Design a protein with these regions (language model features):
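Hydrophobic anchor at the start of a short beta-strand
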Residues: 5, 55-57, 82, 159, ...
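Short beta-strand scaffold segments in enzyme catalytic cores
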Residues: 48, 93-97, 222-226
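Short beta-strands and strand-loop turn motifs
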Residues: 105-107, 127-135, 162, 180-183
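Glycine-rich phosphate/adenosyl-contacting loop at the front of the ribokinase-like
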Residues: 1-60, 69, 234
Length: 289
């Protein structure tokens, strides 16, 4: 039976990647940088991978009217149902700066407009899985995800929450089915940052007070799925923008731990959140432990 997915992205972003030949020094002028721009936001990245895998997927949230065309084109390209509400202004631009010596990212706060309730998102009925992912727009209530999780659960859907900070702390009060914090994001919930394998196992047990199934990302090392560790394969990293989102999307689609980690690693080889080739994902899965 086909599964219908809804991805909720309250904080979409245009992901700009700037590549430079060298790490800039104080006062330096970079003359030969290249840049790329791609529509993104965590739940948009999730929706894109689900669509690439052939799933029936809708994506909703709030988009600024001034630069909405890039998102409309991308959603149409992947056959994703567009449920975004258009608001005045522009969608934020996040920037990743990449050099041979390292990289860093600048994330701007999302502006979803003044909070006017969640009715504008439309009905959550008719979906089997609802995935809520990303930060909240500035000025929005910390319990926004809590309200959304409650609303989605009333429809009978499986609810996945990928958030951090106060949005996560408040969101888990509605007990989503799945959460996906990284190690640092666990601390506000359980009081410690897992570092060693026994820490992650203890964290998994503690997180079950807030959800049925915790997934804990350990960055480039790998991922813990309900206490079971899957190591990430080695790849040449180009851009980590959509790695965790692709991992989550693949797990939601197939439930295959190894394939999910392989998909997340493959995403690191692609620019600007572009989905990786499925052949690469399958090849990487062979080396996933």
């Amino acid at each position: 039976m086909a599964v219908n997915y809804l991805c909720i992205c309250l904080s979409p972003a245009i992901d700009a990647t700037v590549r430079m030949d060298a790490w800039p020094t104080d006062g330096s002028i970079i003359k030969n940088a290249t840049d790329t721009f791609a529509p993104g936001g965590k739940a948009v990245n999730v929706a894109r991978w689900l669509a690439k895998r052939g799933a029936s997927v809708a994506c909703g949230g709030f988009l600024g009217e001034d630069n909405v065309a890039m998102f409309e084109k991308e959603l149409k390209r992947y056959g994703i149902e567009d449920r975004f509400v258009r608001i005045a202004g522009s969608t934020r631009v996040n920037e990743m700066f990449v050099t041979p010596q390292g990289s860093f990212k600048v994330n701007r706060p999302a502006d979803g407009g003044p909070y006017k309730g969640l009715e504008g998102l439309g009905s959550l009925e008719g979906f089997d899985v609802v995935i809520m992912s990303g930060s909240l727009p500035k000025g929005w209530p910390d319990d926004t995800y809590c309200m959304l999780v409650e609303a989605a659960k009333k429809t009978g859907a499986k609810v996945v929450l990928d958030a951090s900070g106060k949005a996560l702390v408040e969101g888990v009060k509605a007990h989503p089915d799945v959460i996906k914090p990284n190690a640092e994001e666990c601390e506000p919930l359980i009081g410690f940052v897992p570092k060693m394998p026994e820490d992650f196992k203890r964290a998994t047990v503690a997180l079950k007070a807030f959800c049925d199934y915790p997934i804990i990302s350990d960055g480039g090392t790998g991922c813990w799925f309900d206490g079971e560790f899957v190591a990430a394969p080695k790849v040449e990293v180009l851009d980590t923008t959509a790695a965790g989102d692709t991992l989550l999307a693949e797990w939601c689609f197939s439930g295959d731990f190894r394939l999910a980690v392989a998909a997340g690693s493959a995403a690191c080889t692609m620019p600007g959140g572009e989905p990786p080739n499925m052949e690469l994902v399958e090849k990487l899965k062979e080396s996933v432990k």
